[in-house]
């Protein structure tokens, strides 16, 4: 794994080295017929500066270069702001939905320190979006406006192109199990999921239906226990229907047998209840019992949830 990562780092370093001798931004992007979108007319109190990528910026600390430029390409002026916003993307990076996710995100959050900003190529954005957008959608998050790929230049020698997309993913391997069915086995892991879910319910499942590429979990009328109600209203719980986005064709071992009770978590998005995690209820599981008992005293992160989701206003 170390050899593969070294090769990747070397490839990125060669690319960035070549960019040092590049023409100015205005000359180059005029030539390619692309202009960076204005930063909303925002004026900055400080001139651009370069600084080391700190160890407590884990999204980008291992990206392959050591120094970054501020303000970055997302208009963050301070390192504190970068850390706050970047931390919410760590869960997506951990999912390994595309080999170039880190390169793409860090080209925006922690752009390499050169005399002019270097943007990601449109193809890099499109590759990352193709790999990661379906996973984000499964948790109720659309691909964000700030990452729309039309904002970035068509491929040329002076933007950051796809680096590692042709290489196999490194461990942990990409799983074919539905994202909502990947299980945490520790109490802390379960409580993190509970933190980032709008609601948590112990319930029985009457049946499962397939609808436009999604699974619909139809709850039994009785035997429901709201452990975390969140935005759920009486009409939601009376006939509980959970949508498992993009879950029609991927396996979910927990749902192979619908006997017994389930611990389910989810988010309410535009009136629809989206399933984010499902476990078979096991009263002998000490980690699960601990998580359910102490979920409200767990110190949930403020900024962790862009991907798994701080609940949106309802």
Curated annotation (Swiss-Prot):
InterPro entries: Frizzled/SFRP, Frizzled_dom, Frizzled_dom_sf, Netrin_domain, Netrin_module_non-TIMP, SFRP5_CRD, TIMP-like_OB-fold. Residues 45-162 form the FZ domain. This is Secreted frizzled-related protein 5. GO terms for biological process: cell differentiation; convergent extension involved in axis elongation; digestive tract morphogenesis; negative regulation of Wnt signaling pathway; post-anal tail morphogenesis; regulation of establishment of planar polarity; Wnt signaling pathway. Disulfide bonds join 50-113, 60-106, 97-132, 121-159, 125-149, 178-250, 181-252, 195-300. It comes from the Eukaryota. It is found in: Secreted. Its main location: secreted. Residues 178-300 form the NTR domain. Residues 1-21 form the signal peptide. Keywords: Developmental protein, Differentiation, Disulfide bond, Secreted, Signal, Wnt signaling pathway. Belongs to the secreted frizzled-related protein (sFRP) family. Soluble frizzled-related proteins (sFRPS) function as modulators of Wnt signaling through direct interaction with Wnts. They have a role in regulating cell growth and differentiation in specific cell types. SFRP5 may be involved in determining the polarity of photoreceptor, and perhaps, other cells in the retina. CDD domains: CRD_SFRP5, NTR_Sfrp1_like. It comes from Mus musculus. Gene3D superfamilies: 2.40.50.120, Frizzled cysteine-rich domain. The FZ domain is involved in binding with Wnt ligands.
């Amino acid at each position: 794994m170390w050899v593969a990562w070294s090769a990747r780092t070397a490839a990125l370093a060669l690319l960035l080295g070549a960019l040092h001798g590049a023409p100015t931004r205005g000359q180059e992007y005029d030539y390619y017929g692309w202009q960076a979108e204005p930063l909303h007319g925002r004026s900055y109190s400080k001139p651009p500066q370069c600084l080391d990528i700190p160890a407590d910026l884990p999204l980008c600390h291992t990206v392959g270069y050591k120094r970054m430029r501020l303000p970055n390409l997302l208009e963050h002026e301070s390192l504190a702001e970068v850390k706050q916003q970047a931390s919410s993307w760590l869960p997506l990076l951990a999912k390994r939905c595309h080999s170039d996710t880190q390169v793409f995100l860090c080209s925006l959050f922690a752009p390499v320190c050169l005399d002019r900003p270097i943007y990601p190529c449109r193809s890099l954005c499109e590759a990352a979006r193709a790999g990661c957008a379906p996973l984000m959608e499964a948790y109720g998050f659309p691909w964000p406006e700030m990452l729309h790929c039309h904002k970035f230049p068509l491929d040329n020698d002076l933007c950051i192109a796809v680096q590692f997309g042709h290489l196999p993913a490194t461990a942990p391997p990409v799983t074919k199990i539905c994202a909502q069915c990947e299980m945490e086995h520790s109490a802390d892991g379960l409580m993190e999921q509970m933190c980032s879910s709008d609601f948590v319910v112990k319930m029985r499942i009457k049946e499962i239906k397939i609808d436009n590429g999604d699974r619909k979990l139809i709850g039994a009328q009785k035997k429901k226990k709201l452990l975390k109600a969140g935005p759920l209203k009486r009409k939601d719980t009376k006939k509980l229907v959970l949508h498992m986005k993009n879950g029609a064709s991927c396996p979910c071992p927990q749902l192979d047998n619908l006997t017994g009770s389930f611990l389910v978590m989810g988010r309410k998005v535009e009136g629809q209840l989206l399933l984010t995690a499902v476990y078979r209820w096991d009263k002998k599981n000490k980690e699960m019992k601990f998580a359910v008992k102490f979920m409200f005293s767990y110190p949930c992160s403020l900024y962790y949830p862009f991907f798994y989701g701080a609940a949106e206003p309802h």
